[in-house]
């Protein structure tokens, strides 16, 4: 039996998903494909790496296989006993570009196991199992957006998700005449995981000082309690980024794509100066694009300290500057960026 789960890109709402905020992701037309069959021991094979991991019992491997092992362990916590299986994995989602290859692997694994063993897990169960696998087993304390987008997405729509309540609505992606790209900076700075966890701690500290249990209850008035400084900058980003998500949803519904470009630039400036998670390479890409005709908007995507930049451009405009950007980026940083044109996609599904 074969299934596939898509990667995702988040149009806007960065570093808000673990702060009870709003996000606006959509699944992309790049997938993790997974084939499952019976076996006498757990066996996980990656076609991309040409690597096989065999386990007689479910334990940590400190490899890509941990995403699958973590999912199986989370399913077993819910009272199911999973017999050994062989799982073959193939993926065309770029790793490290902020397109959620790990969430797609988790969602594909949970869905495949549910279907194969007839567990009838709901999509929301699959999302929660996948997120808990990453937090509890892999050890990355992520939000829930990536897994949610990989499971629930619908082609030609973005998901407006409230990460506090998990209420969501589909918002039409009316992009006629426009294109979406992600530019992979091909850098990943060492700070990424330590600074990500530090940002989470800073947000929790700010809430403690303010005396509220969620950023959704924080008002502008509350900001005075932070007495300026780093924590104020972090909270300002979260509050303003939530507002930008709401404005972007409105603009999408009203077919005002150009307005969205402005919100993307504002989001990047906020991630650069208030949340302080961008880097020279992604800043360079966004600054370069700002000056160019036909580019509507751009911002860094993902956790930061490298990774990708999302771009909305008028049809045909981006290709005309791609080579110039590549050359200028190379002369500045000594590496070449990678460009991906993205289309929206449905969420996890069986492959016929």
UniProtKB/Swiss-Prot annotation:
Matches recorded under Pfam families: GalKase_gal_bdg, GHMP_kinases_C, GHMP_kinases_N
Catalytic activity: alpha-D-galactose + ATP = alpha-D-galactose 1-phosphate + ADP + H(+)
Site (described: Transition state stabilizer): 8
Keywords annotated in UniProt: ATP-binding, Carbohydrate metabolism, Cytoplasm, Galactose metabolism, Kinase, Magnesium, Metal-binding, Nucleotide-binding, Transferase
Record localization: Cytoplasm
Binding site for Mg(2+): 102, 134
GO CC, any one term: cytosol
One GO BP: galactose metabolic process
Domain of life from the UniProt record: Bacteria
Molecular function GO terms recorded: ATP binding; galactokinase activity; magnesium ion binding
Top-tier EC class: transferase
Catalytic residues (positions): 146 (proton acceptor)
The EC number(s) this enzyme carries: 2.7.1.6
Record has Nucleotide-binding as a keyword: yes
Binding site for substrate: 14-17, 196
Listed pathway(s): Carbohydrate metabolism; galactose metabolism
Classification via InterPro entries: Galactokinase, Galactokinase_bac, Galactokinase_CS, GalKase_N, GHMP_kinase_C_dom, GHMP_kinase_C_sf, GHMP_kinase_N_dom, GHMP_knse_ATP-bd_CS
Record-listed ATP binding positions: 46, 96-102
PROSITE patterns reported for this sequence: GALACTOKINASE, GHMP_KINASES_ATP
Homology family: Belongs to the GHMP kinase family. GalK subfamily.
Listed NCBIfam families: gal_kin (TIGR00131), PRK03817.1 (NF003006)
Described function: Catalyzes the transfer of the gamma-phosphate of ATP to D-galactose to form alpha-D-galactose-1-phosphate (Gal-1-P).
Name the record gives this protein: Galactokinase
Source organism per UniProt: Thermosipho africanus (strain TCF52B)
């Amino acid at each position: 039996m074969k299934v596939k789960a898509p990667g995702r890109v988040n149009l806007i709402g960065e570093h808000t998903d673990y702060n009870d905020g709003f996000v606006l992701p959509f699944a992309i037309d790049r997938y993790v494909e997974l084939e499952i069959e019976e076996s006498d021991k757990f066996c996980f094979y990656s076609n991309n790496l040409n690597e096989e991991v065999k386990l007689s019992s479910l334990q940590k491997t400190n490899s890509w296989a941990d995403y699958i092992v973590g999912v199986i362990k989370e399913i077993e916590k819910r009272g199911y006993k999973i017999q050994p299986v062989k799982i073959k994995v193939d993926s065309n989602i770029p790793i490290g570009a902020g397109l959620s290859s790990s969430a797609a692997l988790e969602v594909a694994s949970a869905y495949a196991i549910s279907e194969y063993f007839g567990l009838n897990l709901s999509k929301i169960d699959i999302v929660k199992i996948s997120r808990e696998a990453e937090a509890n087993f892999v050890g990355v304390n992520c939000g829930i957006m990536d897994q949610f987008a990989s499971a629930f997405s619908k082609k030609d729509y973005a998901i407006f998700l409230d990460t506090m309540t998990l209420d969501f609505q589909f918002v039409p992606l009316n992009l006629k005449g426009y294109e979406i790209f992600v530019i992979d900076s091909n850098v990943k700075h060492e700070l990424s995981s330590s600074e990500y966890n530090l940002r989470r701690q800073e947000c929790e500290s700010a809430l403690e000082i303010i005396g509220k249990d969620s950023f959704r209850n924080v008002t502008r008035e509350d900001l005075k309690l932070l007495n300026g400084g780093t924590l104020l900058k972090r909270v300002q980003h979260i509050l303003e980024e939530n507002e930008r998500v709401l404005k972007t949803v409105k603009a999408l519904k009203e077919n005002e794509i150009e307005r969205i470009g402005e919100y993307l630039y504002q989001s990047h400036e906020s991630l650069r100066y208030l949340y302080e998670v961008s880097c020279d390479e992604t800043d360079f890409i966004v600054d370069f694009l700002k000056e160019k005709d036909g580019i509507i908007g751009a911002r860094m995507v993902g956790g930061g300290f490298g990774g990708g930049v999302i771009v909305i451009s008028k049809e045909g405009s981006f290709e005309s500057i791609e080579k110039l950007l590549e050359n200028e980026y190379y002369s500045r940083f000594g590496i070449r960026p990678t460009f991906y044109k993205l289309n929206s996609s449905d969420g996890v599904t069986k492959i016929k």
